[in-house]
Amino acid sequence: MKDSIKDFVPFERVEPDMEFINNVVGIAEESGYELKKASVFCTPSIAAEYYHLEEIKEFDTDLIEMETASLYLMADLLEMPTVALLVVSDNSATGAALVGRTEEEQRKYDYGRNVVLPTMILKTADAK
């Protein structure tokens, strides 16, 4: 955690606790799930990523989203390891829409949200 809010640097690269991340990936593998590690550009804005999409792509990141920024800030404040388990809903870089998915895409998305994500949360919490 920064000593002063004045020390905050926007767009600072944050590295997760890889030992914790690898433990969570191991839990997923033991459960028969495949987790993909990805670089995430986190922004607290709900719309700025569209205006700045080309600039954000220069960060060579895999995902852009909003909520993880707050999650990692709180983990830093509480000095706790954390992992963002994300189910990707849309992709503004490729044009994959939030709506209009094929039946198979919707089935995979629903399975991730309704089965994999809750299972991983519970198993990760039990492992602590």
Positions of predicted regions on the chain:
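Glycine-rich phosphate- or other oxyanion-binding loops that anchor nucleotides, phosphorylated ligands
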Residues: 1-128
